[in-house]
């Protein structure tokens, strides 16, 4: 017999590798040299789901991990009660994490059998605030602001529904508002809602029982 593919060994043999792990954690983030929308390119993005503790061979976590690699820094997740709420939020451990800037998925679970409505409500709530921001930015265009802020506001209005580049546009607008908002109530109000400048990526996670039976009447 060739032996088993996996063998249990003492954990003590791996303690010498702890400094290597610590070194890897301290490495600076690297830019992805490929387009992340390709199969190969997606794997150069940092996963924002790690160490889930899901069952061996679980088919859910690879999909969830891939989604975090593509959209994780601006994700909102409405999670149906089931396996994905067990490996996804078994307190005090949470497998969803953040990137080097502190951005990552925001996760919530409804114990009731209404995850479709729950996720839709999350999306509609965010859309309402962003609509308010769009109206306030349109009004702010008439204010005597700098050319740079004027251009940033117009760009945000023109591309508010585009996911590509939304983080960069939001950062630029937020930074300029921080410089010019003093004593201007409308700009102060906009800056207070700066967390919504980024176009959020809303996801609804659930199993086939929920999607095709329990909650099929909904979204």
Residue ranges with predicted function:
Residues 13-16, 84-88, 210-214:
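Flexible loop/turn segments at secondary-structure boundaries
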Residues 89-127:
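Mobile "lid/hinge" segments at catalytic clefts and subdomain interfaces of large enzymes
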Residues 49-81, 85-92:
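N-terminal amphipathic, basic-rich helices that act as targeting or association modules
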Residues 39-50, 170-174, 198:
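Gly-rich Lys/Arg/Thr-decorated short loops/hinges at beta-loop-alpha junctions or inter-strand turns
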Residues 219:
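Conserved small/polar residues in nucleotide/adenosyl-binding loops
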Residues 1-14, 62, 72:
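Iron-sulfur cluster-binding cysteine motifs and their immediate structural context
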Residues 75-79, 200-214:
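A short, small-residue-rich loop immediately preceding and capping a beta-strand
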Residues 111-186:
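N-terminal leader/propeptide and maturation segments of large enzyme subunits in energy/redox metabolism
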């Amino acid at each position: 017999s060739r032996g088993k593919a996996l063998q249990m060994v003492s954990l003590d043999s791996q303690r010498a590798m702890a400094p290597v792990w610590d070194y890897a954690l301290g490495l600076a983030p690297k830019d992805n040299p490929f387009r992340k929308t390709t199969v190969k390119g997606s794997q150069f993005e940092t996963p924002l789901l790690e160490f889930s503790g899901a069952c061996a061979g679980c088919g859910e976590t690879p999909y969830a991990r891939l989604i975090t690699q593509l959209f994780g820094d601006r994700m909102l997740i409405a999670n149906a009660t089931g396996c994905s709420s067990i490996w996804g939020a078994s307190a005090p451990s949470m497998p969803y994490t953040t990137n080097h800037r502190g951005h990552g998925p925001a996760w919530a679970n409804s114990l009731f059998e209404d995850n479709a409505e729950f996720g839709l409500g999350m999306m509609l709530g965010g859309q309402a605030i962003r609509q308010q921001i769009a109206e306030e930015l349109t009004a702010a265009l008439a204010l005597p602001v700098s050319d740079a802020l004027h251009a940033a506001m117009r760009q945000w209005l023109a591309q508010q529904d585009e996911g590509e580049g939304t983080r960069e546009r939001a950062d630029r607008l937020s930074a300029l508002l921080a410089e010019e908002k003093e004593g201007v109530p409308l700009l102060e109000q906009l800056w207070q809602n700066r967390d919504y400048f980024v176009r959020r990526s809303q996801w609804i996670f659930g199993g086939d029982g929920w999607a095709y039976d329990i909650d099929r009447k909904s979204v």
